[in-house]
């Protein structure tokens, strides 16, 4: 999944934001479960970007 920037997120409406948030949380959960099973993080940079994107989406949702 491509990382979303603030400008792209601000162009979305509420329904799109909620859908994107659900997708990001599901993707993050998959990374967490993989790393728990393997004992090592597959791609820590990607996990960090997903967390930050989730935070961006939540921040913009709260602004609206």
UniProtKB/Swiss-Prot annotation:
- GO cellular component terms? ribonucleoprotein complex; ribosome
UniProt keywords (A-Z) are:
Ribonucleoprotein, Ribosomal protein
Lineage, top-rank taxon, reads Archaea
Q: Which PROSITE patterns match?
A: RIBOSOMAL_L29 (PS00579)
Q: Where is the signal peptide?
A: none
> An example of a Gene Ontology BP annotation on this entry?
translation
A molecular-function term among this protein's GO annotations: structural constituent of ribosome
Q: Record's family?
A: Belongs to the universal ribosomal protein uL29 family.
Protein name from the UniProt record = Large ribosomal subunit protein uL29
